[in-house]
Swiss-Prot record:
Family the entry assigns: Belongs to the conotoxin A superfamily.
Positions of modified residues (Cysteine amide): C60
Lineage: Eukaryota, Metazoa, Spiralia, Lophotrochozoa, Mollusca
GO molecular function: acetylcholine receptor inhibitor activity; toxin activity
A Pfam match: Toxin_8
Tissues expressing the protein: Expressed by the venom duct.
Subcellular location: Secreted
Free-text comment about domains: The cysteine framework is I (CC-C-C). Alpha4/7 pattern.
Name of the molecule in the record: Alpha-conotoxine-like Am1.3
Key word Glycoprotein present: no
Source organism: Conus amadis (Amadis cone)
Residue positions assigned to the propeptide: 22-44
Length: 61
């Protein structure tokens, strides 16, 4: 294999890696948002229960 061919293969590998990384990052945004919503609901539930407020005052501000 010549230098041009090796460089072309290198560029293709870098491009493929970048595309896969970019697409997997976008796919996880929805899961992160759902997890944040669940955490917020859990904290709100804790703030309405006096024993939970006593154990975790930092959550309820």
């Amino acid at each position: 294999m010549g230098m041009r061919m090796m460089f072309t293969v290198f560029l293709l590998v870098v491009l493929a890696t970048t595309v896969v990384s970019f697409m997997s990052g976008r796919a996880s945004h929805g899961r992160n948002a759902a997890a944040s919503d669940l955490i917020a609901l859990t904290i709100k539930g804790c703030c309405s229960v006096p024993p939970c407020i006593a154990n975790h005052p930092e959550l309820c501000g």
